[in-house]
């Protein structure tokens, strides 16, 4: 059995926001980079359902911003879990004139309404596509060593990666709806604009 986690490198404290944060950094560049997100405390056991929720949100938000509106090409929109926190965020680069169009949309994009009417088939398709990519990444010996090593280092459990993927396989539509209702409301959002 692994010893208790006492590695100074991975012990961390998190920013505790009690008010929204807005940072606007003038840079004079030809591109503007935007980050918007919010942090939620989460319950143990919700990690896999939050991953599935993040994957679904990513597909829907990126389709809206990139394909329907044509306002960004390279972007990220998802949730990231670390310890007992989840960061729901959108990050992208765009033309400077698009920043004022996009910023007001972020809260409504990263919300329950974006999910719309999901089916169990939608959830399973999204999870299976992700699992397929993850299995492909783990084919080579060097990548297997990487995932075992990072699981041991960051989680103090060498098989954490495999256990997480197994938990993700078991996520259902009910789980996704439950965590969406529980966590998907922006409070004290962080907005960062680098122009």
Task: List the predicted regions and their residue ranges.
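M16 family metallopeptidases and their MPP-like homologs
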Residues: 32-43, 66-170, 187-195
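Periplasmic-binding protein-like
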Residues: 61-64
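Short, exposed beta-strand-loop hairpins at the edges of beta-sheets
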Residues: 180-182
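An aromatic/glycine/proline-enriched structural segment found at the starts
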Residues: 1-41
């Amino acid at each position: 059995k692994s010893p208790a986690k006492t590695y100074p490198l991975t012990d961390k404290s998190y920013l505790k926001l009690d008010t929204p944060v807005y940072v606007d950094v003038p840079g004079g560049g030809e591109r503007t980079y935007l980050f918007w997100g919010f942090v939620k405390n989460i319950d143990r056991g919700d990690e896999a359902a939050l991953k599935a929720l993040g994957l679904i949100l990513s597909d829907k938000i990126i389709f809206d911003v990139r394909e329907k509106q044509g306002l960004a090409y390279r972007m990220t929109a998802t949730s990231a879990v670390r310890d007992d926190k989840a960061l729901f965020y959108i990050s992208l680069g765009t033309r400077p004139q698009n920043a004022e169009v996009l910023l007001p949309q972020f809260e409504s994009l990263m919300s329950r309404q974006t999910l719309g009417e999901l089916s169990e088939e939608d959830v399973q398709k999204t999870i299976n596509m992700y699992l397929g990519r993850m299995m492909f990444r783990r084919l080579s010996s060097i990548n297997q060593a990487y995932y075992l090593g990072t699981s041991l280092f960051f989680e103090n459990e060498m098989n954490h990666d495999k256990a997480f993927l197994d938990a993700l396989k078991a996520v259902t539509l009910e789980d996704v709806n439950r965590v969406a209702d529980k966590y998907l409301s922006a409070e004290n959002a962080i907005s960062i604009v680098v122009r």
